[in-house]
């Protein structure tokens, strides 16, 4: 089985309206729900517009898909600037492109960032199609692609507010049994020391460096600003 996923790049910004769907349309009609789900399944990104801006007001919408997964970050997880942060999300610093919780055995299937307020300078969002980058490597840098698929990386979360550390080994690019893309794991902030055979280390460093550079290349990336009431779904 090969999914109907549509790879995209920076040109998606020129058709940004095509990935937007109204909150009330999703909440009140199966047609709106299907439109949202197809965007997520086929494109991997969607912006829900004109949602309420009260805390937890997105839950009725999310429950149209499934239950919300609980984590130790609390539900919902608030992306705010706090003193003595235990996570880079709790700072005003720009975040590099990454995927969340790569040290989970099963990282989130979908995530939803609900913008309640965005009045500060900066605060723009970005999106990158990791599968498009993987496809580029598959077609143009096969040795690097194979390294990213075949050599597991070590991810670890060491949070000073938690009693335990969490870690997991997984490749940067995972494939299904049919050779289709399954998931991407990229997070410099939670990548641990390399845990591979010494003969592979130089090759792994080279592969991960190129992968990271391409994941931040403008030709694969879109940038936009979330407005209050937007829900960034991916």
Where are these regions (language model features)?
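Extended acidic/polar, glycine-enriched regions
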Residues: 1-18
């Amino acid at each position: 089985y090969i999914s109907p996923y549509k790879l995209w790049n920076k040109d998606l910004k020129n058709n940004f309206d095509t990935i937007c769907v109204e909150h009330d349309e999703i909440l009140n009609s199966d047609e709106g729900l299907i439109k949202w789900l197809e965007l997520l399944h086929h494109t991997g990104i969607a912006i829900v517009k004109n949602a309420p801006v009260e805390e937890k007001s997105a839950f009725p919408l999310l429950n149209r898909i499934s239950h919300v997964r609980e984590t130790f970050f609390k539900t919902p997880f608030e992306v705010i600037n706090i003193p003595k942060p235990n996570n880079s999300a709790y700072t005003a610093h720009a975040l590099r492109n990454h995927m969340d919780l790569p040290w989970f055995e099963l990282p989130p299937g979908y995530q939803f960032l609900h913008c309640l307020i965005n009045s500060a300078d900066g605060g723009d969002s970005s999106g990158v199609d990791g599968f498009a980058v993987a496809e580029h490597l598959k077609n143009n840098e096969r040795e690097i692609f194979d390294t990213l698929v075949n050599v597991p990386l070590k991810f670890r979360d060491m949070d000073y507010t938690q009693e335990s550390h969490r870690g997991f080994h997984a490749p940067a690019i995972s494939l299904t049994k049919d050779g289709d893309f399954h998931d991407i794991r990229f997070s410099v902030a939670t990548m641990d020391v390399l845990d591979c055979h010494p003969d592979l280390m130089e090759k792994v460093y080279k592969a991960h460096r190129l992968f990271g550079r391409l994941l931040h290349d403008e030709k694969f990336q879109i940038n936009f600003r979330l407005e209050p009431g937007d829900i960034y779904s991916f």
